[in-house]
Amino acid sequence: MRLTEKSEGEQQLKPNNSNAPNEDQEEEIQQSEQHTPARQRTQRADTQPSRCRLPSRRTPTTSSDRTINLLEVLPWPTEWIFNPYRLPALFELYPEFLLVFKEAFHDISHCLKAQMEKIGLPIILHLFALSTLYFYKFFLPTILSLSFFILLVLLLLLFIIVFILIFF
């Protein structure tokens, strides 16, 4: 129950009907609907969107609560994600390719062992020569770091070449 004012100032008890809006509110709603274009009204209850959420002409509207399925976006097959240890289809259809790669790997490994035996002595001599520079303590850290960096780069290049020969 709420109190409403009469023209003479009398107050009378009137039941509160929350479902029925006032006449003034109805007029305001009708006026705002007349001024608002139909395309700017939202789908829910024909309410106007706030100014910060007006639809943009440049960017399409998207919902922010939608989950993105990355499996449809990735450029590789989904089988590779679920089972990374599975062989590619080429090896499953033609298993003799595995034998070719196995033989090539053994040939390359024997060649690398022979090369390392040839290079092994100079590497040992190189490290021995660097160890004699112990008396030159000021230059030793710089020379050691440079020499090991060069050795690391050479080994990295060697592994890259082996990888290319095996897999390509």
Swiss-Prot record:
Regions of compositional bias (Basic and acidic residues) in chain numbering: 1-11
Segments for region (Disordered): 1-63
Transmembrane intervals: 119-139, 148-168
Chain intervals with Low complexity compositional bias: 49-63
Phosphoprotein is among the record's keywords: no
Extent of Polar residues compositional bias: 13-22, 35-48
Highest taxon of the lineage: Eukaryota
Gene Ontology CC terms, in alphabetical order: membrane
Sorted UniProt keywords: Membrane, Transmembrane, Transmembrane helix
Name of the protein in question: Transmembrane protein 31
Organism: Homo sapiens (Human)
Name of the gene: TMEM31
